[in-house]
């Protein structure tokens, strides 16, 4: 018995791994950008920081996954957008610190290497990288029989970006009186899916619920996370933004306070929040308390900006999309987030 056959008998298909690498090359090529050095397949991805033109570069990194949204991708056998979710979760975090994404690495672990399926996953990662302007410079695909079921896989990623030292957004510039602007989310994004799956556990995904405006449930649940990089970078370059909050797990309550000092609070006018239909459906069918929704989900606002009043109109002009004035920064009395 050869080593190759012995390995195959243990459940690891080396040839399938080679096939995955060949399949994903064209997707990786889409993400090429200035600064990338070397080719796919090296022991480490390389990037020439001098190509960014940043005078005082500070590297900012972020890592994340997509949680149990993966279980719905597997359930509905749709794998071509979950990679975008993974990229979004990472790059939206680092843009909140003022960083332009430079490159991305992904990690996929699976019980059985299915090249066609994994190509779809990486194609989604590549699409996310294109939207973020980041190069996909490396990754790992691990076949782990016994750790995962044959149809199961997990996905995580790691993003690195750069900011001018003087343009880092760390909350120190947010002051009382700043206006809170909300940028629309595309849907649930990638948080709260353990609850989402419980609410819709008995649904096939083919249902067209009256709240969902003609869309199938599975389409809404797997809507990829919006990537905010290209919308927000021009604002950072012009130093128009004092604070940024990426609304992820923990909703408004946990994430908004992360962009300002402990002596401040966010006062939010609930009537100005563009609540998406899926959140109304979740609240109704899951019998979730209304106030708890803001502790779990983005409620239609995926990114929140704190902006000086005199810069609001310029920010709206540059964004060229629907921008929601949903509140303001006030002095903290008790709670860090007040929703009225």
From Swiss-Prot:
Record localization: Cytoplasm
Gene3D superfamilies noted in UniProt: PurM-like C-terminal domain, PurM-like, N-terminal domain
Molecular function GO terms recorded: ATP binding; phosphoribosylamine-glycine ligase activity; phosphoribosylformylglycinamidine cyclo-ligase activity
Leading EC class: ligase
CDD domains: PurM (cd02196)
Pfam families found in the cross-reference section: AIRS, AIRS_C
Catalytic activity: 2-formamido-N(1)-(5-O-phospho-beta-D-ribosyl)acetamidine + ATP = 5-amino-1-(5-phospho-beta-D-ribosyl)imidazole + ADP + phosphate + H(+)
Keyword Mitochondrion assigned: no
EC number: 6.3.3.1
Main location: cytoplasm
GO cellular component, one term: cytosol
GO process annotations (BP): 'de novo' IMP biosynthetic process; adenine biosynthetic process
Keywords recorded for this protein, A-Z: ATP-binding, Cytoplasm, Ligase, Nucleotide-binding, Purine biosynthesis
Recorded metabolic or biological pathway in which this protein acts: Purine metabolism; IMP biosynthesis via de novo pathway; 5-amino-1-(5-phospho-D-ribosyl)imidazole from N(2)-formyl-N(1)-(5-phospho-D-ribosyl)glycinamide: step 2/2
NCBIfam families: purM (TIGR00878)
PANTHER family: TRIFUNCTIONAL PURINE BIOSYNTHETIC PROTEIN ADENOSINE-3, TRIFUNCTIONAL PURINE BIOSYNTHETIC PROTEIN ADENOSINE-3-RELATED
Record family assignment: Belongs to the AIR synthase family.
Descriptive protein name: Phosphoribosylformylglycinamidine cyclo-ligase
Annotated organism of origin: Streptococcus pneumoniae (strain Hungary19A-6)
Gene: purM
């Amino acid at each position: 018995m050869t080593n190759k056959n012995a390995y195959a008998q243990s459940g690891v298909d080396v040839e399938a791994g080679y096939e995955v690498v060949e399949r994903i090359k064209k997707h990786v090529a889409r993400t090429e950008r200035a600064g990338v050095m070397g080719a796919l397949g090296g022991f480490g991805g390389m990037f020439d920081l001098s190509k960014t033109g940043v005078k005082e570069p500070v590297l900012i990194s972020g890592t994340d996954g997509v949680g149990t949204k993966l279980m719905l991708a597997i359930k509905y056998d749709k794998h071509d957008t979950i990679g975008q979710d993974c990229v979004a979760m990472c790059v939206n975090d680092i843009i909140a610190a003022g960083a332009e994404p430079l490159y991305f690495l992904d990690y996929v672990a699976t019980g059985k290497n299915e090249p066609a399926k994994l190509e779809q996953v990486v194609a989604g990662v590549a699409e996310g990288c294109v939207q973020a302007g980041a190069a996909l410079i490396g990754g790992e695909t691990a076949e782990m029989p016994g750790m995962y079921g044959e149809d199961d896989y997990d996905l995580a990623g790691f993003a690195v970006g750069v900011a001018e030292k003087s343009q880092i957004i760390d909350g120190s510039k947010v002051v009382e009186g700043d206006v809170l602007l909300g940028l629309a989310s595309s849907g649930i994004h990638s948080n709260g899916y353990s609850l989402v799956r419980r609410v819709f556990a008995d649904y096939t995904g083919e249902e067209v619920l009256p709240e969902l405006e003609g869309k199938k449930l599975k389409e809404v649940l797997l809507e990829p996370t919006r990537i905010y990089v290209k919308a927000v970078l021009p604002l950072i370059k012009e130093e128009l933004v004092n604070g940024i909050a990426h609304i992820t797990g923990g909703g408004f309550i946990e994430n908004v306070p992360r962009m300002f000092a402990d002596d401040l609070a966010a006062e939010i006018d609930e009537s100005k929040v563009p609540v998406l239909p899926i959140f109304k459906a979740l609240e109704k069918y899951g019998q979730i308390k209304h106030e708890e929704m803001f502790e779990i989900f983005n409620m239609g606002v995926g990114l929140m900006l704190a902006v000086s009043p005199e810069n609001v109109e310029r920010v709206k002009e540059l964004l060229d999309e629907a921008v929601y004035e949903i509140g303001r920064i006030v002095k903290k009395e008790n709670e860090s987030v007040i929703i009225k």
